[in-house]
């Protein structure tokens, strides 16, 4: 259970309906490349003949590469971005992987994973390295981050084979093209500056946890972005609502931080303003952005009190469902 799941089903109707009713509408957005918001545009990176599993890989690896590009470019937040980007993979590596029987005789996995971390760090430090090699390393880190999925469906030797298997050429080539478009859209355009404030994968504790999980893609200079690498583009309330829900959770964190400054440790945006939300359609180089204050989507103290009430009402159930699945998989014996 997570924010995404909550918005797609009717189990927690009061929270879903609140977010849906207040999510900025299509007309509130502005595109960086078109006069009309969410207008169908020519695809700059063609989808091609790829399988669903390849599309999933492309989405995850491209998101990772976008953050690496930002970490390499900015000055102040370079290390913070890199560490946040790899936090989940490292947690699973140190926790689930090393404590599971799959680790036996899998020194190759450890070496492969640690080499991937070294390659991506060198890229961030602006060392000369071929982009395809960085993408292969990003794929390795993605597989460790996706460990719960892999350990659930593969036995020990199958896991080893799949973990060491390189990313196929079709995926690598598409991620390359998506990375080039991202660099043009965010870096070369001047949207991101050397001194930009960038926070990768911000979470919103304790409110993310109470909703069963919730981590945003990236925050850049007051705007919270969600990345989409699918071939379809258009306005969908639940996709926009997901980013808006993160804004709401951050508002709750900011409220908490007035009473307890340690909130900043688990909610990195609690001390920052989210002035707007945006969807980036990476195959089109299109950013659809909404300034929250201009469309009446900011929240009052009364709104926050209501949100706090309904989230707390469902918190135990959402947490239990999220944690029981993670614990079940981590404790599997192969």
Located regions from the model:
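Residue(s) in the substrate-gating loop at a strand-loop-helix junction
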Residues: 1-181
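Metal-dependent nuclease catalytic regions and adjoining charged, substrate-binding loops involved
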Residues: 259-334
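Active-site metal-binding core of divalent-cation-utilizing nuclease and nuclease-like domains
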Residues: 192-219
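Eukaryote-skewed repeat-based solenoidal scaffolds used as protein-protein interaction platforms
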Residues: 176-201
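An active-site-proximal "capping" alpha-helix that borders the catalytic cofactor pocket
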Residues: 242-249
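Active-site-adjacent loop/helix micro-motif of nuclease/hydrolase catalytic cores
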Residues: 232-242
């Amino acid at each position: 259970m997570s924010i995404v799941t909550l918005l797609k089903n009717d189990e927690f109707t009061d929270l879903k309906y609140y977010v849906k009713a207040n999510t900025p509408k299509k007309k509130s957005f502005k595109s960086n490349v078109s006069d009309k918001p969410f207008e169908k545009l020519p695809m700059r990176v063609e989808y091609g003949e790829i399988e669903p599993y390849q599309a999933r890989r492309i989405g995850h690896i491209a998101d990772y590469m976008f953050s690496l590009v930002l970490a390499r470019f900015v000055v102040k937040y370079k290390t913070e971005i890199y560490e946040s980007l790899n936090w989940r993979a490292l947690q699973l590596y140190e926790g689930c992987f090393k404590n599971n029987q799959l680790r036996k005789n899998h020194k190759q996995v450890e070496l492969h994973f640690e080499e991937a971390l070294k390659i991506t760090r060198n890229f961030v430090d602006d060392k000369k390295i071929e982009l395809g090699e960085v993408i292969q390393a990003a794929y390795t880190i993605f597989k460790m981050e996706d460990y719960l999925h892999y350990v659930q469906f593969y036995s020990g030797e199958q896991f080893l084979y799949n973990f060491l298997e390189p990313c196929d050429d079709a995926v690598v080539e598409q991620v390359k093209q998506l990375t080039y478009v991202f660099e043009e859209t965010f870096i070369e355009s001047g949207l991101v500056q050397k001194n930009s404030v960038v926070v990768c994968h911000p979470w919103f504790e304790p409110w993310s946890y109470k909703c069963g999980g919730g981590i945003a893609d990236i925050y850049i200079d007051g705007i919270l972005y969600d990345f989409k690498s699918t071939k379809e583009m258009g306005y969908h309330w639940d996709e926009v609502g997901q980013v808006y829900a993160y804004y709401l959770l951050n508002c709750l964190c900011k409220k908490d931080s007035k009473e307890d400054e340690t909130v900043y440790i688990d909610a990195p945006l609690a001390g920052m303003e989210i002035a707007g939300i945006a969807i980036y359609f990476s195959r089109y180089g299109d950013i659809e952005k909404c300034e929250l204050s201009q469309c009446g989507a900011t929240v009052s103290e009364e709104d926050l009190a209501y949100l706090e009430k309904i989230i707390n009402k469902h918190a135990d159930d959402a947490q239990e469902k999220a944690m029981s699945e993670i614990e079940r998989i981590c404790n599997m014996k192969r």
